Amino acid sequence: MEARMTGRRKVTRRDAMADAARAVGVACLGGFSLAALVRTASPVDARAIRPPGALPEQDFLAACVHCGLCVQACPYGTLSLAEWSDEAELGTPFFTPREVPCYMCKDVPCARACPTGALDRDIPSIRDADMGVAVLVGHETCLNYKGLNCSICVRVCPIRGDAISLEPQEIDGRRVMIPVVHSASCTGCGTCEKQCVLGHAAIRVLPRDLGLGGPGRNRAGRKA
């Protein structure tokens, strides 16, 4: 039997074949473990913003088959399928409001295209969608808090007056008009985040459970 020296150990062909088999087994086990990790990764802390009509996150992940039909149906190129570096489970649809918000199509084509019900095809209206909720995260940077008069987030809101408004507040002895999000009406479309004039938007869309610490998506949209 042929043999060769590796360091101080004499390695036979049989030893080499056994080592190779063990390496393959470890690789397979590692691949299985990685796949299992991806499948069972908890989405609790995920900040992914889902398309309108999405079921609660766990139900959504169970129903979504990663087909991409919702992405193809969106006329604005809002939706993408998640890659490894994204804040969403691999292959699932999401969008980044700062890049392209949801333009709230009345016929909700993305939900209508879903073959499994991961996106609720029976959502009554786009105004019933619960993609998330806008949250004013940049109190230190929002121009209104600095005493300036900016109303862009209010003016661009597709349901202006219901989802967001300017309300008077006293800050450091000054009377200023501050953007106030009315979460019961906000759909999380992200138009306000997209149009914020700051380099880092002072207003951001977050999943409802993360933004408000309350119940998130449900099949009929938001519950008051």
UniProtKB/Swiss-Prot annotation:
Signal sequence, renumbered to the chain: 1-41
Keyword vocabulary terms for this entry: 4Fe-4S, Electron transport, Iron, Iron-sulfur, Metal-binding, Plasmid, Repeat, Signal, Transport
Entries under Pfam families matching the protein: Fer4_7
Annotated [4Fe-4S] cluster 1 binding sites: 64, 67, 70, 74
Positions annotated to bind [4Fe-4S] cluster 3: 142, 150, 153, 157
GO molecular function: 4 iron, 4 sulfur cluster binding; metal ion binding
Entry binding sites for [4Fe-4S] cluster 4: 186, 189, 192, 196
Residue ranges of every copy of the 4Fe-4S ferredoxin-type domain listed in the record: 54-84, 91-124, 133-169, 177-208
Residues binding [4Fe-4S] cluster 2: 102, 105, 110, 114
The organism's place on the tree of life at top rank: Bacteria
InterPro entries: 4Fe4S_Fe-S-bd, 4Fe4S_Fe_S_CS, MauM_NapG
Pathway participation: One-carbon metabolism; methylamine degradation
Family matches, as PROSITE patterns: 4FE4S_FER_1 (PS00198), 4FE4S_FER_2 (PS51379)
Annotated NCBIfam families: mauM_napG, PRK09476.1
Described function: Involved in electron transfer.
Name of the protein in question: Methylamine utilization ferredoxin-type protein MauM
Gene: mauM
